[in-house]
Amino acid sequence: MKITPIAFESLGVRSQATLIETKDLRVLVDPAISLAPRRYNLPPHQREVDRLTELAKVLVDVAKDVDVIIVSHYHYDHHDPGYVIPTDIYKNKLVFIKDPQNMINNSQKYRRAPRFLRSIKDKPSKIEIADGKTFEVGHTTISFSPAVPHGADERLGYVIQVAISDKDSTVIFTSDIEGAPKDVHLKFTKEKMPKTIIIDGPLSYLLGRVLKEEELEKSIRNMEEIVKNGLETVIIDHHVLRDINYAEVLKPVYDIAKDLGVRVTTAAEYLNLEPLILEARRKELFKEDNRPAKIPRGLANLLSAGEG
């Protein structure tokens, strides 16, 4: 099995787009890319826009040759109705989606999911609602958790976690569980016993606003439990990489992983690259170059459509 992170916060954008290849299947998970509309009360910097444009091209190119596309939920850094990533990537693909009607918040149920499904209408070879189901595709097994909360607050909606297995190994993509602040977030991982997990990490950059101290502490404890679950590799990237101090936040997890011989890494480091932290450094970027960014129309429309 080969795992290739395509776009993540450690690669300079908001995304969890990941390519997973088994012996007989190429699966693309959450093919979307976004930026924070505002951070430190600043709009995106030109370096962020350029990086998004660069990775969007890579993502579209990768999508041409995949067999399966998975959409774990309907936030704009996980799905795209055509703002930045053209919906033609779904042509002739088998598409697994989060249930657009059940265990879903109102903004996704009545606006985002319907718009997305209209945008890809008649393009996939087949669309399957995936929540809680298991599918055999060739010699590859793709399993989905029941819908679980998007972090500690169900008002943000629900996501489905994904386990992809061949005869050799299993990888879990947790989607936006925000570092597993609830015990229900752990159930799927404990059932599937993966060798590799891709997890987003807590919203520590919003501590004291959206995230409570006790929720952060529970996330870290539960991530420690995940590391103890027989894993070989843990890719922690997405929400927590929006915090410039992410390494300090995750130190307890790193420490336990080191003791157990588990590799804990960002998506960039998994690719043997230095993390390219842009959003968390936006103030610094504007101090270096204060010119307004030239934002393409599609990205401008995406940013105006709302965060998340």
Curated annotation (Swiss-Prot):
It holds the Pfam family Lactamase_B_2. It comes from Saccharolobus islandicus (strain M.16.4 / Kamchatka #3) (Sulfolobus islandicus). InterPro entries: Metallo-B-lactamas, RibonucZ/Hydroxyglut_hydro, UPF0173_UPF0282_UlaG_hydrolase, UPF0282_hydrls. NCBIfam families: PRK04286.1-1. It comes from the Archaea. This is UPF0282 protein M164_2122. Gene3D superfamilies: Ribonuclease Z/Hydroxyacylglutathione hydrolase-like. Belongs to the UPF0282 family.
